[in-house]
Amino acid sequence: MSGHSKWHNIQAKKSKVDAKRGKIFTKIGKEIAIAAKNGGPNPDANPKLRDVIAKAKANNMPKDSIERAIKKAAGELAGVNYEEILYEGYGPDGIAVLVQALTDNKNRSAGNVRHAFSKHGGNLGSTGCVSFMFQTKGQIVIEKNDELDEEELMMMALECGAEDFQSEDEVYIITTSPEDFGSVRETLEEKGLEFLEAEVKSIPDTYTVIDENTAGKFQKMLDVLEDDEDVQDVYHNAEFPEGWEE
């Protein structure tokens, strides 16, 4: 059950953007606040909030920032209605792209996303044009270390409901169904494991290798999308060239 999921390839580009712009805590904080607003501030009674808090912890978001985000739900977000919207389209050279937005203004979001696509050699498509190329899965990423036995971790993950276990150079990747993600994550947490990533996301069925020229265009498109305050996540099926840097 080992394989190459391209996690480092994609995560390196995403982390680079998030670190450069300092946006990640703001985006996750928004998710926490809205999850608390919709389902209540108690994580024990709100599975969605539990999942987002796990995502926050995996990204090293401070505890006080998480608590402030929950309190926002009863304050400044009390009268604001946010919608989750999924945009689909193609990046340069036909890269399949999904953009997950959380917005209080659909017209603003649609305009910004459409502009990001068209300006960088892509085009925004209709619903369903690329989503069939992706599967929604829970993904838990754990950094390798000398104290972790790969065989034991794999058996533990599969026994508590994981669908797949992969080993990359520096990480283990545990994949679950969306429905089992919470229970698998909580079981592993109870065993004292810490995560580099823990969230439900869209994972492409296959990846498309792109050249350096396309990579440069596409990275600029990703920069613009991930800098948008309404955009929460961007998923794609591009595999950047080995060792490529912007």
Curated annotation (Swiss-Prot):
Subcellular location per the Swiss-Prot or TrEMBL entry: Cytoplasm
Gene Ontology MF term list: DNA binding
InterPro entries named among the record's database cross-references: Integrase-like_N (IPR017856), TACO1_YebC-like_2nd/3rd_dom (IPR048300), TACO1_YebC_N (IPR049083), Transcrip_reg_TACO1-like (IPR002876), Transcrip_reg_TACO1-like_dom3 (IPR026564), YebC-like (IPR029072)
GO cellular component: cytosol
Annotated keywords: Cytoplasm, DNA-binding, Transcription, Transcription regulation
Any single biological process term in GO: regulation of DNA-templated transcription
UniProt family annotation: Belongs to the TACO1 family.
PANTHER family xrefs: TRANSCRIPTIONAL REGULATORY PROTEIN YEBC-RELATED, TRANSLATIONAL ACTIVATOR OF CYTOCHROME C OXIDASE 1
Name of the featured protein: Probable transcriptional regulatory protein ORF2U
Higher taxonomy: Bacteria, Bacillati, Bacillota, Clostridia, Eubacteriales
